[in-house]
Amino acid sequence: MILMSGQMEQYLFHRGEFRQAYEYFGAHPTRSSTIFRIWAPSAKSVAVVGDFNDWRAREEDYCHKLTNEGIWEVEIKKIKKGNLYKYQIETSWGEKILKSDPYAFYSELRPQTASIVNGKPKFRWADKRWLNNREIGYAKPINIYEVHLGSWKKKEDGTYYNYKEIAELLVEYMLEMNYTHIEIMPIIEYPFDGSWGYQGTGYYSVTSRYGTPDDFMYFVNYFHKNNLGVILDWVPGHFCKDSHGLYRFDGSACYEYEDPSLGENEWGSANFNVSRNEVRSFLLSNLYFWIKEFHIDGIRMDAVSNMLYYKDGLSENKHSVEFLQYLNQSLHEEYPDVMLIAEDSSAWPLVTKYQADGGLGFDFKWNMGWMNDTLKYMEQDPFFRKSHHGKLTFSFMYAFSENFILPLSHDEIVHGKNSILNKMPGYYEDKLAHVKNLYSYQMAHPGKKLNFMGNEFVQGLEWRYYEQLEWQLLKDNKGSQDIQKYVKALNKLYLEEEALWYDGQDGFEWIEHENINENMLIFLRKTPNMEDFIIAVFNFSGKDHEIYPLGVPLEDGEYEVILDSNEKKFGGSYQGRKRKYKSIKKSWNYREQYIEIKIAKNSAVFLKYKK
Protein backbone atom coordinates (compact mmCIF):
# COMPACT_ATOMS: atom_id res chain seq x y z
CA MET A 1 0.00 0.00 0.00
CA ILE A 2 1.44 3.38 -1.05
CA LEU A 3 0.56 6.08 1.47
CA MET A 4 0.01 9.78 0.99
CA SER A 5 3.25 11.38 -0.03
CA GLY A 6 3.50 14.14 2.57
CA GLN A 7 4.91 16.56 0.03
CA MET A 8 5.33 19.46 2.45
CA GLU A 9 7.26 17.27 4.90
CA GLN A 10 9.50 15.99 2.11
CA TYR A 11 10.06 19.51 0.78
CA LEU A 12 11.12 20.88 4.18
CA PHE A 13 13.29 17.83 4.89
CA HIS A 14 15.24 18.15 1.65
CA ARG A 15 15.64 21.90 2.25
CA GLY A 16 17.19 21.31 5.69
CA GLU A 17 14.34 23.13 7.47
CA PHE A 18 12.15 20.33 8.82
CA ARG A 19 11.72 21.04 12.54
CA GLN A 20 9.40 18.09 13.18
CA ALA A 21 11.13 15.40 11.11
CA TYR A 22 10.67 12.95 13.99
CA GLU A 23 6.90 13.13 13.49
CA TYR A 24 7.29 11.96 9.88
CA PHE A 25 10.29 9.61 9.92
CA GLY A 26 10.79 6.54 12.10
CA ALA A 27 8.16 4.07 13.31
CA HIS A 28 4.64 5.38 13.97
CA PRO A 29 2.09 2.88 15.30
CA THR A 30 -1.57 3.18 14.31
CA ARG A 31 -4.46 1.07 15.62
CA SER A 32 -3.74 -1.90 13.37
CA SER A 33 -0.32 -1.27 11.84
CA THR A 34 2.92 0.68 12.01
CA ILE A 35 4.15 3.14 9.38
CA PHE A 36 7.91 3.24 8.78
CA ARG A 37 9.78 5.98 6.93
CA ILE A 38 13.51 6.33 6.44
CA TRP A 39 15.99 8.32 4.40
CA ALA A 40 18.53 6.17 2.56
CA PRO A 41 19.51 7.96 -0.69
CA SER A 42 21.97 5.37 -2.05
CA ALA A 43 19.97 2.24 -1.17
CA LYS A 44 18.76 -0.14 -3.88
CA SER A 45 16.07 -1.47 -1.56
CA VAL A 46 14.90 -1.07 2.04
CA ALA A 47 12.90 -3.52 4.14
CA VAL A 48 11.85 -3.66 7.79
CA VAL A 49 12.84 -6.80 9.69
CA GLY A 50 12.31 -7.71 13.32
CA ASP A 51 10.88 -10.14 15.83
CA PHE A 52 7.54 -9.96 13.99
CA ASN A 53 8.97 -11.68 10.87
CA ASP A 54 11.85 -13.66 12.42
CA TRP A 55 14.26 -11.03 11.03
CA ARG A 56 13.55 -12.13 7.45
CA ALA A 57 11.95 -9.66 5.07
CA ARG A 58 8.69 -10.74 3.46
CA GLU A 59 7.31 -9.12 0.34
CA GLU A 60 5.02 -6.86 2.39
CA ASP A 61 7.97 -5.66 4.51
CA TYR A 62 9.72 -3.88 1.63
CA CYS A 63 9.53 -0.10 1.45
CA HIS A 64 8.36 2.02 -1.48
CA LYS A 65 10.66 4.81 -2.61
CA LEU A 66 8.77 8.09 -2.28
CA THR A 67 11.33 10.60 -3.57
CA ASN A 68 14.31 10.53 -5.87
CA GLU A 69 16.33 11.89 -2.94
CA GLY A 70 15.83 8.63 -1.05
CA ILE A 71 12.81 8.69 1.27
CA TRP A 72 11.36 5.18 1.74
CA GLU A 73 8.06 4.15 3.33
CA VAL A 74 6.06 1.06 4.24
CA GLU A 75 2.99 0.24 6.35
CA ILE A 76 3.11 -3.17 8.03
CA LYS A 77 0.09 -4.77 9.67
CA LYS A 78 0.04 -6.26 13.16
CA ILE A 79 3.23 -4.58 14.37
CA LYS A 80 2.61 -3.02 17.74
CA LYS A 81 4.35 -1.08 20.46
CA GLY A 82 7.23 -3.12 21.87
CA ASN A 83 8.19 -4.96 18.68
CA LEU A 84 11.91 -5.02 17.83
CA TYR A 85 12.97 -3.92 14.37
CA LYS A 86 15.82 -2.78 12.11
CA TYR A 87 16.09 -1.65 8.52
CA GLN A 88 17.53 -4.12 6.04
CA ILE A 89 19.25 -1.89 3.51
CA GLU A 90 20.58 -3.12 0.19
CA THR A 91 23.58 -1.02 -0.78
CA SER A 92 24.33 0.20 -4.28
CA TRP A 93 26.65 -2.80 -4.78
CA GLY A 94 24.10 -5.34 -3.54
CA GLU A 95 25.23 -5.99 0.04
CA LYS A 96 22.46 -6.22 2.64
CA ILE A 97 23.17 -4.49 5.96
CA LEU A 98 21.08 -4.10 9.12
CA LYS A 99 20.68 -0.66 10.66
CA SER A 100 18.91 0.71 13.71
CA ASP A 101 16.36 3.44 13.06
CA PRO A 102 17.94 6.92 13.29
CA TYR A 103 14.52 8.26 14.37
CA ALA A 104 13.64 5.48 16.84
CA PHE A 105 12.02 6.72 20.06
CA TYR A 106 13.36 3.77 22.06
CA SER A 107 16.11 1.16 21.70
CA GLU A 108 17.31 -2.10 23.19
CA LEU A 109 19.70 -2.05 26.12
CA ARG A 110 23.28 -2.43 25.02
CA PRO A 111 24.93 -4.64 23.85
CA GLN A 112 21.76 -5.31 21.83
CA THR A 113 21.12 -2.74 19.12
CA ALA A 114 17.59 -3.17 17.75
CA SER A 115 15.11 -0.31 17.70
CA ILE A 116 11.81 -0.69 19.55
CA VAL A 117 8.44 0.39 18.19
CA ASN A 118 7.30 2.91 20.77
CA GLY A 119 5.50 5.88 19.29
CA LYS A 120 5.57 9.31 20.88
CA PRO A 121 5.19 9.04 24.66
CA LYS A 122 1.87 10.20 26.10
CA PHE A 123 2.88 11.70 29.43
CA ARG A 124 0.66 13.89 31.61
CA TRP A 125 2.82 16.89 32.35
CA ALA A 126 2.31 19.00 35.47
CA ASP A 127 4.90 21.73 34.91
CA LYS A 128 2.81 24.47 33.30
CA ARG A 129 3.67 27.00 35.99
CA TRP A 130 7.39 26.35 35.52
CA LEU A 131 7.19 26.69 31.73
CA ASN A 132 5.11 29.87 31.93
CA ASN A 133 7.72 31.51 34.15
CA ARG A 134 10.79 30.12 32.39
CA GLU A 135 13.33 32.54 30.97
CA ILE A 136 16.93 32.46 29.76
CA GLY A 137 18.28 33.77 33.05
CA TYR A 138 20.76 36.46 32.04
CA ALA A 139 19.66 38.44 35.11
CA LYS A 140 19.07 35.48 37.38
CA PRO A 141 21.26 33.13 39.41
CA ILE A 142 22.35 30.07 37.44
CA ASN A 143 24.29 27.50 39.46
CA ILE A 144 24.55 24.20 37.59
CA TYR A 145 25.22 20.73 39.00
CA GLU A 146 26.73 18.58 36.22
CA VAL A 147 25.74 14.93 36.56
CA HIS A 148 26.48 11.59 34.93
CA LEU A 149 23.37 9.59 35.81
CA GLY A 150 25.12 6.22 35.80
CA SER A 151 27.74 7.12 38.39
CA TRP A 152 26.19 9.74 40.67
CA LYS A 153 24.72 7.06 42.90
CA LYS A 154 23.98 3.35 42.44
CA LYS A 155 21.85 0.79 44.23
CA GLU A 156 23.44 -1.53 46.78
CA ASP A 157 23.69 -4.31 44.19
CA GLY A 158 25.58 -1.99 41.82
CA THR A 159 22.73 -1.53 39.34
CA TYR A 160 21.48 1.81 38.07
CA TYR A 161 18.62 3.79 39.53
CA ASN A 162 16.02 4.44 36.85
CA TYR A 163 15.05 7.96 35.79
CA LYS A 164 12.15 8.11 38.25
CA GLU A 165 14.13 6.87 41.23
CA ILE A 166 17.18 9.04 40.67
CA ALA A 167 15.04 12.12 40.02
CA GLU A 168 13.74 12.05 43.57
CA LEU A 169 17.20 11.48 45.05
CA LEU A 170 18.79 14.23 42.97
CA VAL A 171 16.08 16.81 43.60
CA GLU A 172 16.27 16.33 47.36
CA TYR A 173 20.06 16.68 47.28
CA MET A 174 20.16 19.65 44.90
CA LEU A 175 17.58 21.59 46.89
CA GLU A 176 19.54 20.95 50.06
CA MET A 177 22.73 22.16 48.33
CA ASN A 178 21.07 25.25 46.77
CA TYR A 179 21.71 24.52 43.08
CA THR A 180 19.40 25.94 40.41
CA HIS A 181 19.88 23.58 37.44
CA ILE A 182 21.07 20.11 36.63
CA GLU A 183 23.11 19.46 33.50
CA ILE A 184 22.88 15.83 32.41
CA MET A 185 25.69 14.30 30.41
CA PRO A 186 24.40 12.84 27.11
CA ILE A 187 21.48 10.42 27.31
CA ILE A 188 20.89 9.73 23.63
CA GLU A 189 21.34 6.00 23.03
CA TYR A 190 25.00 5.08 22.83
CA PRO A 191 26.73 1.68 22.65
CA PHE A 192 29.90 2.17 24.74
CA ASP A 193 29.67 3.13 28.41
CA GLY A 194 33.22 4.50 28.31
CA SER A 195 32.22 7.23 25.86
CA TRP A 196 30.05 8.75 28.65
CA GLY A 197 27.36 9.29 25.99
CA TYR A 198 29.41 11.60 23.79
CA GLN A 199 29.63 9.00 21.00
CA GLY A 200 26.00 8.23 20.39
CA THR A 201 23.87 7.13 17.48
CA GLY A 202 20.26 6.96 18.71
CA TYR A 203 19.58 10.69 18.74
CA TYR A 204 15.83 10.39 19.32
CA SER A 205 16.10 7.49 21.73
CA VAL A 206 16.62 8.26 25.42
CA THR A 207 19.11 5.66 26.63
CA SER A 208 17.42 2.55 27.98
CA ARG A 209 20.15 2.17 30.64
CA TYR A 210 17.97 4.12 33.05
CA GLY A 211 14.44 3.41 31.84
CA THR A 212 11.89 4.47 29.26
CA PRO A 213 11.04 7.79 27.57
CA ASP A 214 8.07 8.10 29.95
CA ASP A 215 10.43 7.62 32.89
CA PHE A 216 12.64 10.46 31.66
CA MET A 217 9.62 12.70 31.21
CA TYR A 218 8.80 11.99 34.85
CA PHE A 219 12.40 13.01 35.68
CA VAL A 220 12.06 16.41 33.98
CA ASN A 221 8.55 16.98 35.31
CA TYR A 222 9.69 16.24 38.87
CA PHE A 223 12.55 18.71 38.60
CA HIS A 224 10.22 21.41 37.29
CA LYS A 225 7.69 20.81 40.06
CA ASN A 226 10.54 21.51 42.48
CA ASN A 227 11.67 24.66 40.63
CA LEU A 228 14.86 23.17 39.23
CA GLY A 229 15.87 23.52 35.57
CA VAL A 230 17.11 20.69 33.35
CA ILE A 231 19.94 21.19 30.84
CA LEU A 232 20.82 18.44 28.41
CA ASP A 233 24.28 17.76 27.02
CA TRP A 234 23.84 17.39 23.24
CA VAL A 235 26.39 16.37 20.61
CA PRO A 236 25.51 17.86 17.20
CA GLY A 237 29.01 17.58 15.78
CA HIS A 238 29.89 13.90 15.62
CA PHE A 239 28.59 10.36 16.16
CA CYS A 240 29.98 6.87 16.76
CA LYS A 241 31.02 4.54 13.96
CA ASP A 242 29.39 1.37 15.26
CA SER A 243 28.07 -0.69 12.36
CA HIS A 244 24.42 -0.67 13.46
CA GLY A 245 24.18 3.12 13.57
CA LEU A 246 24.36 6.22 11.40
CA TYR A 247 27.82 5.53 9.98
CA ARG A 248 27.66 4.48 6.30
CA PHE A 249 23.96 4.18 6.85
CA ASP A 250 23.01 3.09 3.34
CA GLY A 251 26.49 1.90 2.43
CA SER A 252 27.57 5.41 1.49
CA ALA A 253 28.59 8.48 3.46
CA CYS A 254 25.03 9.43 4.32
CA TYR A 255 25.25 11.43 7.55
CA GLU A 256 29.01 12.00 7.46
CA TYR A 257 31.50 13.49 4.99
CA GLU A 258 32.82 11.27 2.22
CA ASP A 259 36.25 12.89 2.51
CA PRO A 260 38.04 11.46 5.61
CA SER A 261 39.97 14.70 6.07
CA LEU A 262 36.62 16.39 6.77
CA GLY A 263 34.79 13.49 8.38
CA GLU A 264 37.37 12.26 10.91
CA ASN A 265 38.24 13.73 14.31
CA GLU A 266 40.50 13.13 17.31
CA TRP A 267 37.94 10.94 19.09
CA GLY A 268 37.68 8.35 16.32
CA SER A 269 34.05 9.22 15.60
CA ALA A 270 32.51 10.65 12.42
CA ASN A 271 31.64 14.32 11.91
CA PHE A 272 28.13 15.18 10.77
CA ASN A 273 28.07 16.58 7.23
CA VAL A 274 25.95 19.65 7.90
CA SER A 275 26.42 20.87 4.34
CA ARG A 276 23.81 18.24 3.48
CA ASN A 277 20.26 19.49 3.97
CA GLU A 278 18.83 16.18 5.15
CA VAL A 279 21.47 16.00 7.91
CA ARG A 280 20.59 19.55 8.92
CA SER A 281 16.92 18.55 9.20
CA PHE A 282 17.90 15.51 11.29
CA LEU A 283 19.78 17.66 13.83
CA LEU A 284 17.39 20.62 13.76
CA SER A 285 14.46 18.32 14.40
CA ASN A 286 16.35 16.53 17.16
CA LEU A 287 16.91 19.79 19.01
CA TYR A 288 13.18 20.56 18.79
CA PHE A 289 12.37 17.00 19.85
CA TRP A 290 14.14 17.28 23.21
CA ILE A 291 12.75 20.73 23.94
CA LYS A 292 9.17 20.23 22.74
CA GLU A 293 8.58 16.65 23.81
CA PHE A 294 10.73 16.51 26.96
CA HIS A 295 10.44 20.15 28.14
CA ILE A 296 14.21 20.58 28.36
CA ASP A 297 15.22 24.05 29.62
CA GLY A 298 18.67 24.29 28.11
CA ILE A 299 20.95 22.61 25.60
CA ARG A 300 24.70 22.51 26.11
CA MET A 301 26.25 21.81 22.70
CA ASP A 302 29.39 19.75 23.03
CA ALA A 303 32.64 20.31 21.11
CA VAL A 304 31.51 23.37 19.16
CA SER A 305 35.10 24.12 18.16
CA ASN A 306 35.18 20.77 16.32
CA MET A 307 32.29 22.07 14.23
CA LEU A 308 33.71 25.55 13.64
CA TYR A 309 37.03 24.28 12.32
CA TYR A 310 38.11 21.41 10.14
CA LYS A 311 40.50 18.78 11.46
CA ASP A 312 43.57 20.99 10.98
CA GLY A 313 42.14 23.43 13.54
CA LEU A 314 42.85 26.35 11.20
CA SER A 315 40.38 26.18 8.31
CA GLU A 316 36.88 27.43 9.12
CA ASN A 317 33.96 25.14 8.36
CA LYS A 318 31.60 27.70 6.85
CA HIS A 319 28.80 25.16 6.54
CA SER A 320 28.89 24.49 10.29
CA VAL A 321 29.06 28.19 11.13
CA GLU A 322 26.01 28.92 8.99
CA PHE A 323 24.18 25.88 10.38
CA LEU A 324 24.81 26.84 14.02
CA GLN A 325 23.56 30.35 13.32
CA TYR A 326 20.43 28.98 11.64
CA LEU A 327 19.89 26.37 14.36
CA ASN A 328 20.10 28.87 17.20
CA GLN A 329 17.98 31.48 15.46
CA SER A 330 15.28 28.94 14.55
CA LEU A 331 15.05 27.64 18.08
CA HIS A 332 14.92 31.09 19.65
CA GLU A 333 12.08 32.08 17.34
CA GLU A 334 9.89 29.36 18.84
CA TYR A 335 11.48 28.91 22.27
CA PRO A 336 13.00 32.24 23.35
CA ASP A 337 13.09 30.99 26.94
CA VAL A 338 15.41 28.00 26.34
CA MET A 339 19.14 28.36 27.01
CA LEU A 340 21.62 27.45 24.27
CA ILE A 341 25.11 26.92 25.66
CA ALA A 342 28.33 26.47 23.68
CA GLU A 343 31.17 24.31 24.96
CA ASP A 344 33.78 25.99 22.80
CA SER A 345 37.50 25.93 23.54
CA SER A 346 38.44 28.15 20.60
CA ALA A 347 38.85 31.91 20.44
CA TRP A 348 35.96 32.26 17.97
CA PRO A 349 34.46 35.75 18.49
CA LEU A 350 30.83 36.71 19.12
CA VAL A 351 29.68 33.25 20.17
CA THR A 352 26.90 34.72 22.34
CA LYS A 353 26.02 37.64 20.09
CA TYR A 354 23.09 37.94 17.70
CA GLN A 355 23.36 36.49 14.21
CA ALA A 356 22.54 39.91 12.75
CA ASP A 357 25.75 41.18 14.33
CA GLY A 358 27.81 38.30 12.98
CA GLY A 359 27.43 36.16 16.10
CA LEU A 360 26.61 32.48 16.46
CA GLY A 361 23.51 33.19 18.54
CA PHE A 362 24.23 31.14 21.68
CA ASP A 363 23.03 32.43 25.04
CA PHE A 364 26.05 31.32 27.04
CA LYS A 365 29.54 30.00 26.45
CA TRP A 366 31.70 27.89 28.74
CA ASN A 367 34.73 29.95 29.79
CA MET A 368 37.41 27.32 29.19
CA GLY A 369 40.17 29.92 29.42
CA TRP A 370 39.10 30.87 32.95
CA MET A 371 39.00 27.21 33.96
CA ASN A 372 42.45 26.37 32.59
CA ASP A 373 44.17 29.49 33.91
CA THR A 374 42.56 29.28 37.34
CA LEU A 375 43.42 25.63 37.86
CA LYS A 376 47.01 26.17 36.71
CA TYR A 377 47.32 28.98 39.23
CA MET A 378 45.78 26.98 42.07
CA GLU A 379 48.10 24.03 41.40
CA GLN A 380 51.10 26.23 42.27
CA ASP A 381 52.55 26.30 45.76
CA PRO A 382 51.62 29.67 47.33
CA PHE A 383 55.31 30.58 47.42
CA PHE A 384 55.49 30.49 43.61
CA ARG A 385 52.08 31.97 42.81
CA LYS A 386 53.35 35.52 42.46
CA SER A 387 55.01 34.42 39.21
CA HIS A 388 51.60 33.33 37.89
CA HIS A 389 49.43 36.21 39.11
CA GLY A 390 48.35 37.06 35.57
CA LYS A 391 46.51 33.76 35.31
CA LEU A 392 44.09 35.08 37.93
CA THR A 393 43.63 38.57 36.54
CA PHE A 394 43.65 37.90 32.78
CA SER A 395 40.10 36.49 32.67
CA PHE A 396 38.73 39.84 33.87
CA MET A 397 40.07 41.41 30.66
CA TYR A 398 37.47 39.52 28.61
CA ALA A 399 34.90 38.57 31.28
CA PHE A 400 32.15 40.59 29.57
CA SER A 401 33.04 39.88 25.94
CA GLU A 402 30.61 36.92 26.03
CA ASN A 403 27.92 35.64 28.37
CA PHE A 404 30.08 33.15 30.22
CA ILE A 405 29.55 30.10 32.39
CA LEU A 406 32.50 29.26 34.66
CA PRO A 407 32.90 25.46 34.58
CA LEU A 408 34.73 23.08 36.88
CA SER A 409 33.55 20.16 34.78
CA HIS A 410 34.05 16.42 34.38
CA ASP A 411 36.81 16.97 31.81
CA GLU A 412 39.14 18.34 34.49
CA ILE A 413 39.05 15.32 36.81
CA VAL A 414 39.74 12.41 34.44
CA HIS A 415 42.60 10.93 32.40
CA GLY A 416 45.31 11.54 34.99
CA LYS A 417 44.43 15.20 35.63
CA ASN A 418 43.63 14.45 39.31
CA SER A 419 40.57 15.29 41.36
CA ILE A 420 40.02 18.91 42.36
CA LEU A 421 41.36 18.06 45.83
CA ASN A 422 44.56 16.48 44.57
CA LYS A 423 45.30 19.29 42.15
CA MET A 424 45.90 21.49 45.20
CA PRO A 425 49.39 21.80 46.76
CA GLY A 426 50.43 21.03 50.33
CA TYR A 427 49.20 18.73 53.06
CA TYR A 428 45.58 17.59 53.33
CA GLU A 429 44.47 20.56 55.47
CA ASP A 430 46.17 22.93 53.01
CA LYS A 431 44.39 21.29 50.09
CA LEU A 432 41.02 21.78 51.76
CA ALA A 433 41.73 25.48 52.31
CA HIS A 434 42.79 25.89 48.67
CA VAL A 435 39.61 24.16 47.47
CA LYS A 436 37.41 26.54 49.49
CA ASN A 437 39.35 29.46 48.07
CA LEU A 438 38.94 28.13 44.53
CA TYR A 439 35.18 27.69 44.91
CA SER A 440 34.87 31.14 46.48
CA TYR A 441 36.77 32.70 43.59
CA GLN A 442 34.51 30.93 41.09
CA MET A 443 31.41 32.18 42.90
CA ALA A 444 32.62 35.78 43.07
CA HIS A 445 33.96 35.98 39.50
CA PRO A 446 31.51 37.36 36.88
CA GLY A 447 29.72 34.55 35.04
CA LYS A 448 27.25 31.77 35.76
CA LYS A 449 28.49 28.69 37.64
CA LEU A 450 28.91 24.99 36.93
CA ASN A 451 30.42 22.23 39.06
CA PHE A 452 30.69 18.53 38.38
CA MET A 453 29.18 16.09 40.84
CA GLY A 454 31.55 15.14 43.64
CA ASN A 455 33.41 18.44 43.54
CA GLU A 456 31.14 19.63 46.34
CA PHE A 457 32.61 17.15 48.82
CA VAL A 458 36.10 16.79 47.32
CA GLN A 459 36.41 13.23 46.11
CA GLY A 460 39.94 11.95 46.49
CA LEU A 461 39.79 9.87 43.33
CA GLU A 462 39.30 11.01 39.77
CA TRP A 463 35.81 10.50 38.38
CA ARG A 464 35.16 6.93 37.23
CA TYR A 465 32.10 6.44 35.05
CA TYR A 466 31.64 2.83 36.18
CA GLU A 467 31.46 3.52 39.94
CA GLN A 468 29.28 5.75 42.07
CA LEU A 469 30.73 8.78 43.84
CA GLU A 470 32.63 8.26 47.10
CA TRP A 471 29.59 8.94 49.26
CA GLN A 472 31.19 7.16 52.21
CA LEU A 473 33.47 10.20 52.61
CA LEU A 474 30.48 12.14 53.94
CA LYS A 475 30.13 9.57 56.72
CA ASP A 476 33.71 9.15 57.85
CA ASN A 477 35.76 12.08 56.52
CA LYS A 478 35.53 15.44 58.28
CA GLY A 479 37.29 17.24 55.43
CA SER A 480 34.60 16.19 52.94
CA GLN A 481 31.88 17.11 55.42
CA ASP A 482 33.40 20.57 55.93
CA ILE A 483 33.74 21.27 52.19
CA GLN A 484 30.16 20.18 51.54
CA LYS A 485 28.94 22.52 54.30
CA TYR A 486 30.95 25.36 52.78
CA VAL A 487 29.67 24.74 49.24
CA LYS A 488 26.12 24.68 50.59
CA ALA A 489 26.68 28.04 52.33
CA LEU A 490 28.44 29.48 49.27
CA ASN A 491 25.61 28.41 46.96
CA LYS A 492 23.08 29.93 49.36
CA LEU A 493 25.00 33.20 49.42
CA TYR A 494 25.04 33.25 45.61
CA LEU A 495 21.28 32.68 45.46
CA GLU A 496 20.51 35.40 47.98
CA GLU A 497 22.89 38.14 46.85
CA GLU A 498 22.00 39.77 43.54
CA ALA A 499 25.43 41.39 43.44
CA LEU A 500 26.97 37.95 42.84
CA TRP A 501 24.78 37.08 39.86
CA TYR A 502 24.22 40.48 38.31
CA ASP A 503 26.62 40.04 35.40
CA GLY A 504 26.47 43.41 33.67
CA GLN A 505 29.81 45.08 33.03
CA ASP A 506 28.84 47.70 35.61
CA GLY A 507 28.55 44.91 38.19
CA PHE A 508 32.29 44.53 38.70
CA GLU A 509 34.99 46.86 39.98
CA TRP A 510 38.58 46.29 41.05
CA ILE A 511 39.80 47.28 44.49
CA GLU A 512 43.19 45.60 44.42
CA HIS A 513 44.68 43.44 41.69
CA GLU A 514 48.36 44.38 41.60
CA ASN A 515 49.56 43.06 44.98
CA ILE A 516 51.52 40.27 43.37
CA ASN A 517 53.95 39.69 46.25
CA GLU A 518 51.14 39.12 48.75
CA ASN A 519 49.02 37.01 46.34
CA MET A 520 46.00 39.16 47.19
CA LEU A 521 42.98 39.87 45.01
CA ILE A 522 40.09 42.15 46.00
CA PHE A 523 37.11 43.32 43.95
CA LEU A 524 33.54 44.54 44.17
CA ARG A 525 30.47 42.75 42.86
CA LYS A 526 27.52 45.12 42.73
CA THR A 527 24.05 45.83 41.41
CA PRO A 528 22.77 49.09 39.84
CA ASN A 529 21.76 50.05 43.40
CA MET A 530 24.83 51.99 44.60
CA GLU A 531 24.53 50.62 48.15
CA ASP A 532 24.01 46.98 47.18
CA PHE A 533 27.46 45.50 46.75
CA ILE A 534 29.74 42.78 48.09
CA ILE A 535 33.49 42.96 48.56
CA ALA A 536 35.28 39.69 47.76
CA VAL A 537 38.73 39.36 49.34
CA PHE A 538 41.09 36.53 48.42
CA ASN A 539 44.34 35.62 50.13
CA PHE A 540 46.08 33.09 47.90
CA SER A 541 49.28 33.23 49.98
CA GLY A 542 50.48 31.13 52.89
CA LYS A 543 50.58 34.18 55.17
CA ASP A 544 47.97 35.25 57.74
CA HIS A 545 47.04 38.93 57.93
CA GLU A 546 45.83 40.18 61.32
CA ILE A 547 45.35 43.61 59.75
CA TYR A 548 44.92 44.09 56.03
CA PRO A 549 43.79 47.51 54.73
CA LEU A 550 41.50 47.79 51.73
CA GLY A 551 39.75 50.75 50.16
CA VAL A 552 35.96 50.81 50.26
CA PRO A 553 33.36 52.80 48.27
CA LEU A 554 31.27 54.35 51.05
CA GLU A 555 32.20 56.06 54.32
CA ASP A 556 29.01 55.74 56.36
CA GLY A 557 27.78 52.40 57.66
CA GLU A 558 29.52 49.12 58.39
CA TYR A 559 31.14 46.33 56.41
CA GLU A 560 30.06 42.98 57.79
CA VAL A 561 31.70 39.62 57.07
CA ILE A 562 28.89 37.47 55.66
CA LEU A 563 31.06 34.46 54.78
CA ASP A 564 34.60 33.45 55.70
CA SER A 565 36.09 30.24 54.33
CA ASN A 566 38.25 30.01 57.47
CA GLU A 567 35.31 29.69 59.86
CA LYS A 568 35.53 26.80 62.33
CA LYS A 569 32.30 25.22 61.07
CA PHE A 570 33.90 24.86 57.63
CA GLY A 571 37.09 23.28 58.95
CA GLY A 572 38.97 26.56 59.51
CA SER A 573 40.38 28.14 62.64
CA TYR A 574 38.20 31.23 63.20
CA GLN A 575 35.51 30.94 65.85
CA GLY A 576 33.75 34.00 67.15
CA ARG A 577 31.19 36.67 66.44
CA LYS A 578 30.55 37.96 62.94
CA ARG A 579 33.10 40.67 62.30
CA LYS A 580 32.01 44.19 61.39
CA TYR A 581 34.31 46.99 60.27
CA LYS A 582 33.83 50.75 60.21
CA SER A 583 35.60 52.75 57.54
CA ILE A 584 38.57 55.00 58.28
CA LYS A 585 38.64 58.37 56.52
CA LYS A 586 41.94 58.05 54.69
CA SER A 587 42.82 57.36 51.06
CA TRP A 588 43.62 53.74 50.14
CA ASN A 589 43.39 51.77 46.90
CA TYR A 590 42.46 55.05 45.14
CA ARG A 591 39.44 55.45 47.42
CA GLU A 592 38.73 58.07 50.05
CA GLN A 593 38.24 55.61 52.92
CA TYR A 594 39.32 52.13 53.90
CA ILE A 595 38.77 49.36 56.42
CA GLU A 596 41.23 47.02 58.13
CA ILE A 597 40.23 43.37 58.08
CA LYS A 598 41.58 40.09 59.37
CA ILE A 599 42.12 37.35 56.80
CA ALA A 600 43.78 33.97 57.18
CA LYS A 601 46.18 32.36 54.73
CA ASN A 602 44.62 30.55 51.77
CA SER A 603 41.17 31.91 52.49
CA ALA A 604 38.35 34.07 51.17
CA VAL A 605 36.20 36.65 52.91
CA PHE A 606 32.94 38.17 51.64
CA LEU A 607 31.86 41.52 53.12
CA LYS A 608 28.52 43.26 52.68
CA TYR A 609 27.85 46.94 53.17
CA LYS A 610 25.21 47.70 55.83
CA LYS A 611 24.04 51.30 56.14
UniProtKB/Swiss-Prot annotation:
Coiled coil: none annotated. GO terms for biological process: glycogen biosynthetic process. Keywords: Carbohydrate metabolism, Glycogen biosynthesis, Glycogen metabolism, Glycosyltransferase, Transferase. Pathway: Glycan biosynthesis; glycogen biosynthesis. InterPro entries: A-amylase/branching_C, Branching_enzy, GlgB, GlgB_N_E_set_prok, Glyco_hydro_13_cat_dom, Glyco_hydro_13_N, Glyco_hydro_b, Glycoside_hydrolase_SF. It is an enzyme of class 2 (transferase). It catalyses: Transfers a segment of a (1->4)-alpha-D-glucan chain to a primary hydroxy group in a similar glucan chain. GO terms for molecular function: 1,4-alpha-glucan branching enzyme activity; cation binding; hydrolase activity, hydrolyzing O-glycosyl compounds. It comes from the Bacteria. GO terms for cellular component: cytoplasm; cytosol. Pfam families: Alpha-amylase, Alpha-amylase_C, CBM_48. The active site is at residues 302, 343. Its EC number is 2.4.1.18. Monomer. Belongs to the glycosyl hydrolase 13 family. GlgB subfamily. HAMAP family: GlgB. Catalyzes the formation of the alpha-1,6-glucosidic linkages in glycogen by scission of a 1,4-alpha-linked oligosaccharide from growing alpha-1,4-glucan chains and the subsequent attachment of the oligosaccharide to the alpha-1,6 position. This is 1,4-alpha-glucan branching enzyme GlgB. It comes from Fusobacterium nucleatum subsp. nucleatum (strain ATCC 25586 / DSM 15643 / BCRC 10681 / CIP 101130 / JCM 8532 / KCTC 2640 / LMG 13131 / VPI 4355). The lineage of its organism: Bacteria, Fusobacteriati, Fusobacteriota, Fusobacteriia, Fusobacteriales. The gene is glgB.
